[in-house]
Amino acid sequence: MARIAGVDLPRDKRVEIALTYLYGIGLSRSKEILANTGVNPDTRVKDLSDEDALALRSYIEANYQIEGDLRRWETMNIKRLVDIGTYRGRRHRQGLPVRGQRTRTNARTRRGRRLTVAGKKKAPSKK
């Protein structure tokens, strides 16, 4: 089983797809990595030679920020925005959409579940 950046790649998948299990590598970046290292994209992970696995590992570590480093970098960027008090930082802190989307309706993913507010109760009528 190939292990890159602390992640075990699934053995029965094609290398092209298996690389996308790494945080920070999607399909297009995976194809680019395979083209630059000369590894056949149709090879299954279990059929990778040790040289191919080593070539993939060294190329990825040398050229890309993935997994924990990338997550840390993103967190630090958001923290920087919050610390300097930018509009984007305030939106992150408030848990609202950051990129100008509307919030009167929608934005449920960012704002969380809907909180129902109880309506005004009717006073019992006097008879």
From Swiss-Prot:
Renumbered residue ranges of the record's region Disordered: 92-127
Gene Ontology terms, MF aspect: rRNA binding; structural constituent of ribosome; tRNA binding
Cellular component annotations (GO), alphabetically ordered: cytosol; small ribosomal subunit
Ribonucleoprotein listed as a keyword: yes
InterPro entries: Rbsml_uS13_C, Ribosomal_uS13, Ribosomal_uS13-like_H2TH, Ribosomal_uS13_bac-type, Ribosomal_uS13_CS
UniProt keywords, alphabetically: Ribonucleoprotein, Ribosomal protein, RNA-binding, rRNA-binding, tRNA-binding
One GO term of the biological process aspect: translation
One Pfam family this sequence matches: Ribosomal_S13
Basic residues: bias regions: 101-127
Coiled-coil zones: none
Family designation: Belongs to the universal ribosomal protein uS13 family.
NCBIfam families assigned to the protein according to its UniProt record, in alphabetical order: uS13_bact
Functional summary from the UniProt entry: Located at the top of the head of the 30S subunit, it contacts several helices of the 16S rRNA. In the 70S ribosome it contacts the 23S rRNA (bridge B1a) and protein L5 of the 50S subunit (bridge B1b), connecting the 2 subunits; these bridges are implicated in subunit movement. Contacts the tRNAs in the A and P-sites.
Quaternary structure note: Part of the 30S ribosomal subunit. Forms a loose heterodimer with protein S19. Forms two bridges to the 50S subunit in the 70S ribosome.
Protein name in the entry: Small ribosomal subunit protein uS13
Organism annotation: Gloeothece citriformis (strain PCC 7424)
Lineage, opening ranks: Bacteria, Bacillati, Cyanobacteriota, Cyanophyceae, Oscillatoriophycideae
Gene encoding the protein: rpsM
